[in-house]
Every structure is written in C-alpha cells, then in structure tokens.
C-alpha cells in the first residue's frame, strides 16, 4: 500500500479518530441535559431567538405547551418566552385532577337568574305612530304670538318623540341584517311627501359634516325695536325654598317668516343680498347634523334670490326637549301613558317657558330703555291691546362668496332680548335670553339628568354637561342665533316644575351667562360647517331650470339624511288648505 500524500494524512487521521456509529449519520446521540454541569432547556425550532429570554413569565393558561398559532396570536401576544415550545423541566408536578368531583344535593334550587331564557336585551322595531294634530295656521298674516296665560296655543308639527313601541314582550329577538342601522323608533315626517314632488338631492350627515366655508363676522344693515335692561338679580344664587315663580306676562311677540317680513322684502328689492333668512330658520339649517326630530324648511327661488321660509306652526316654532337623549321621551303611540311628559306636550311647555322667562328677567323701566333706529316693524298699536315684548331685530349681512368674480351675500334677521351694562367700562352689552326646563328627572326620557334643586348650585358643570348631551341641537341653535346677532352675552335660565306632575307651574332655580363663542367651543360647534351647509343648499336651488320655483328641505324622520324636493306650484297651498279643513272639523267635533 502506498503511503498517502502529506496533504491528506491529516484528514485521514481525523476521520479515523471519529467514533464508529454503524449505520447512523451525524453527531453522536446523547441524553445529557447539562452543559458544564448547568441544566438547560432543550432547543426548539419553534422558538424565536430575536429577543431576550424572559424566565419570570408564566404561561397564561397554566400550561407550558404552546397552543395553536391562532390562539397564541389572539390571547398571548407579547408573552412568548424562549423555550416555550418544549416541555419545561422546571414545571411543578401536576396536581390531582378534581374536575370530575361534585357534590350531590337534594335541595331544590328556586333562585331565578337575572337573564333567563328569552330575555330581551334590545328594543325591537315598533309600530308606526299616528300623525300629530296641527295647530291653527296664521297664513301670511303678521299675527303675534301671545307669550302669557290665555294666549294662543303653541301648536305645530313637532313630532320629536314619535317612534316605535318599546318591546316589552317575553320573547327576545335575534339580530338580523344591518339591525345596528335600523332606527329604534319609527317617527312620522313633519310634512307629507307627495308623489309629484321631484327629488333633487339626498345628503347624509357624513357629507354635511365635511362641508366648510369661512366667512366674516358680518355687518349690521339696520335695526328695529327696543330693549329693556336685564335684571341682574336673577344672576345671584337662589336661596333654598325661596325660588322665584315663573310669571305669565302677556306681551306681544312675533315670529314672522322670511318672505312675509316687510323689511326683508324691501332689502330684496334693493338687491342687498342673494340669500334671505331668519335666525330661527338659519340656525336649524346650520345645526342640521345635530338634529334628530323631523323638520322641514320651505325654500323659494325668485329670479336669482333665495328665501328660506317656514310653514305656519311648523316644528321650527317649538322648543324641543331632550331631542338628543339616548332614550328620548315616548309618545302615546309608543306606550307612554303620561300625557304631560310626551314630546309634543313637553315642546309646548318649553316654548311657553322660554317666552315668559324672557319677559320676566327684564326691568320694564323707560329710563333704561334702549331704542333702536326704527320701531318694531310688526307691532301695530291700533290693533294690539297688549304692549310689545322687549325685542330688537337686527338685520345683518354675511359674505358667503367663494370667489372674487361672483359675490354672494346673505341677510338674516336676528333677535336680541335685553341689554345690560358692562361692569368694567359701563358700555351696553347685548343679551339673548333662553331657558332650559326640568320636568321630571326620574321619568322616562329624562336622559340621566341630575336633580337641579340639589345639584345645580354644587355641580353646575355636571348639569350643563348633561343638558349639552340631551339637548345638543337646541343649545347649538341658541348659540348660533346669539353669534349671528353678535350678542355679547347668552343667558341660560334653569326653570323647573313646582310639582313634577303639574306642567303649568314653574320656578326659576338660577341663571348662568356665557359668551356665545366660548359656549360654542365647549360644544365643539363649528360655524364654518354651518355656512358650508347653507351655501351648498342655496347653490342646489339656484341650479334649477326654473327661475321661480319652490323647494322643500326635509329631515328624514328616522335616518340622518336631508332630502331636497322641488314641488309644483300650489302644492304647499293645497296642503295648508287641508290642514285648515282638519282644524275646522276638529273644532266642530269639540262643539
């Protein structure tokens, strides 16, 4: 045998030194579990070696073995430890399994479970309620609304609480397709949609919330009426058991729609603006994304001008109550047996309170009276037997132009309720006055409201926060109206029933004042979004082929959608005549 070359001799010696493993291949098999005398966990290919070992973490389910990958990803995220893929030699001995152990008892269990078979967890869709009765319409007449006892009723088309009957049956129901998107109650529309109405546009609240138009603070065009001084004694803390009663003061107040306003008609003839509206109507449109109750606005186009109007005794004439509450007040068709706490009754009560509260908190002193440039345009002393209410009508103009080439202006009639002296410089401050009313904090539909008599003084912030939640749309509208009028202070009164079971006797628990813009910031109210909505709706009407057309903007009663219809000439007049006939039939039936 020839001797191997010097380069291969070292390799041959290395191979000869390897142990003889027979038919196997690879390193020798060993059962040693120590490394230099230190025990260690065996290596597993399932372990991730990209992190430090955490020897202090325990497995979540009390087991050392890894579960399925899906279970690990769902429940054991960020809890993986090195060596978790193999059985640990440090695991304590398994205790005796006692899962099969049980105690036999012959005592009959009579306890009842809270949620038994067929328990109802959600309210189902209820039946459709009937239409509410409409109050007498005033037509185009400039009739005033009495704000005191014995005045005209504040009827209207308010239908805020109409909806489905609460499901109180014994059987539960299963969720179906898009049950989350179905309304909890079925309300009726504020106006009957006829078949010959043409649908122009359908806008949901998501699109409305994205609209934006920056504008200036506006300028005064003219002002009418007069103002009495605000009584600052109402700002003082109320002494317990010494609250002031809300008095029914008979004063002439007016709520004339846009196209019937003689001042707006004169401004339209002078081409002072393209869009005309009142603060009551404009605030509803600007706060549309917050509204829940159904409403409608009549829009008239005359040439290149747009008039935002309201129907007589429509929903806009009434002050809603707990419209935005999670469980709003129920109507009679929904099973409510408490007549004074139904939506329409609460709205009439709130409207009555607001009119009388504004008249009561002013001092009717001629020496402190502030007269505007012109007299009240709606008051006629020869026809009225009561004095006019303290009210100033300011006609203000806003620039809604989107380009320098084409200018678009809006004129709005705003209202101021009182005037007060600034404590610093003694200048007059314009004041708007509104009132929140407490009816029954323990009744259905109260929305978790606190007891004002015990909490208003100590937890005023919590009371206001609850009202912002339950009456978001109403408070937003009042704030917008104050900003449109360029008021310096917005006064909010807190009025409660003397007895929760009686809705015609009230007491004033306190008054709080805010700067309108500060209050808007607290409510996250963006006026630029409201101006964007107004300009968008006006542009849709101006795109119509007819220069003399009428439109109706309707809030869907059960969805967060606005629909714009173009209506034939005379369609709304026919409906008004039908309402008059219904009223006459009702009066004859009562007789």
Curated annotation (Swiss-Prot):
Keywords: Cytoplasm, Initiation factor, Protein biosynthesis, RNA-binding. It is found in: Cytoplasm. Its main location: cytoplasm. Residues 127-141, 148-166 have a biased composition (Gly residues). It holds the Pfam family eIF-3_zeta. Residues 315-329 are annotated as: RNA gate. InterPro entries: eIF3d. One of its GO terms (molecular function) is translation initiation factor activity. The keyword Amino-acid biosynthesis does not apply. Residues 55-67 have a biased composition (Basic and acidic residues). One of its GO terms (biological process) is translational initiation. One of its GO terms (cellular component) is eukaryotic translation initiation factor 3 complex, eIF3m. The keyword Manganese does not apply. Residues 55-74, 122-181 are annotated as: Disordered. Belongs to the eIF-3 subunit D family. The RNA gate region regulates mRNA cap recognition to prevent promiscuous mRNA-binding before assembly of eif3d into the full eukaryotic translation initiation factor 3 (eIF-3) complex. mRNA cap-binding component of the eukaryotic translation initiation factor 3 (eIF-3) complex, which is involved in protein synthesis of a specialized repertoire of mRNAs and, together with other initiation factors, stimulates binding of mRNA and methionyl-tRNAi to the 40S ribosome. The eIF-3 complex specifically targets and initiates translation of a subset of mRNAs involved in cell proliferation. In the eIF-3 complex, eif3d specifically recognizes and binds the 7-methylguanosine cap of a subset of mRNAs. Component of the eukaryotic translation initiation factor 3 (eIF-3) complex. This is Eukaryotic translation initiation factor 3 subunit D. It comes from Neurospora crassa (strain ATCC 24698 / 74-OR23-1A / CBS 708.71 / DSM 1257 / FGSC 987).
